[in-house]
Amino acid sequence: GLFFRTDPKNAVQGGFEIQIASPGLYSGKHIVGSLYDAKEPMVAAGKPDGEWNTMELSCKGSSIKAKVNGKKVIDLNIDDWTEPNKNPDGSKNKFKTALKNLPRTGHFGLQYHGQPVWYRKIKIKPGG
């Protein structure tokens, strides 16, 4: 996955992640394009194994938007996550801190879940 707005000393609990693992490995709030463990993607967007996926991520204040392969997958206001370990829909998540209280700035990180993964052509533009 792509960690963002994260603390490198505590990436899993100290920031956010958009999942980019193989489409067949996970489902729901862990599938390609999800805000990991917090929000499933709006549409299925992952390509089959062996094909490159693209991602665009935009974060401004409490707004987080993401596209995978040109399809809008996340468009949310993180201030809606007001309780630790709980999503706005009432389902549980792994976060010990309410997501609205996580940093609005931080580091990027690239992660894998035990299988080979490749990244290329990474571009970062400052917001404005």
What function would you assign to each model-found segment?
Residues 1-128:
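Carbohydrate-interacting regions of secretory-pathway proteins
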